[in-house]
């Protein structure tokens, strides 16, 4: 792929900026300008709230945890409380692996079944009102618990998805769910509030780039992005 570059003046010095840097900045600005959706526009009887891996092992401790992900808990908590009041169906995926999980060929051992890492963070578990679905891969769509839930809730046409990590488990689930509905020719909306999703930062995994890239891929595939959810009652 050919990468163009532009020369700009900064502090009396010439600097070259690659075109993809400019495009990323433009998309980042676009994301920051996304409007919030009001709860008045959410049809309770048609909606499912999905929380992906908001668990101790990715937020509070463990080899793959990142404390920055903690920032999503406040808006997630507020909407979960709203869902409980309005009887909106809610589910929470929990990464839960056997000690010989095939996924450990890609990621270091984490969230072993029965450990504290698999538990939903206390801020949300205290609220309750949601079904916990264990998963053994980065894609909760394939979990038997979710396939059963989906089969029993085909009347739902709006899935609001949040959690971590934006570019791994959230991305995989959203794409699979969207393409499933497309395959059976069912009109359904997958909605992602970007202030309720986050990913980790590491030497070869830039948080900002990973978030922006994943959100762009989701939007390209028909998933609706919003800045967040404004709760009005």
Residue ranges, per PLM feature:
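Short coil/turn segments at secondary-structure boundaries
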Residues: 63-70, 107-112, 137
């Amino acid at each position: 792929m050919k990468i163009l570059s532009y020369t700009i003046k900064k502090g009396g010095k010439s600097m070259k900026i690659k075109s993809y840097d400019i495009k990323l900045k433009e998309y980042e600005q676009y994301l920051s300008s996304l409007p919030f959706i009001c709860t008045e526009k959410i049809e309770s009887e048609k909606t499912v709230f999905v929380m992906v891996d908001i668990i101790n092992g990715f937020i509070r401790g463990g080899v793959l945890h990142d404390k920055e992900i903690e920032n999503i808990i406040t808006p997630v908590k507020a909407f979960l409380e709203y869902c409980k009041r309005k009887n909106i169906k809610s589910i929470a995926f929990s990464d839960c692996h056997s000690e010989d999980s095939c996924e450990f060929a890609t990621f270091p051992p984490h969230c072993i079944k029965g450990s504290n890492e698999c538990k939903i963070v206390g801020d949300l578990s205290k609220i309750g009102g949601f079904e916990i679905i264990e998963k053994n891969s980065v894609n909760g769509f394939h979990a038997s618990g979710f396939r059963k839930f989906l089969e029993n809730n085909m009347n739902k046409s709006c899935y609001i998805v949040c959690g971590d990590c934006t570019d791994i488990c959230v991305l995989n689930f959203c794409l699979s769910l969207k393409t499933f509905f497309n395959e059976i020719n069912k009109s359904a909306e997958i909605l992602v509030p970007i202030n309720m999703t986050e990913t980790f930062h590491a030497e070869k995994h830039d948080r900002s780039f990973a978030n922006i890239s994943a959100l762009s891929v989701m939007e390209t595939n028909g998933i609706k992005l919003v800045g967040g959810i404004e709760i009005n009652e």
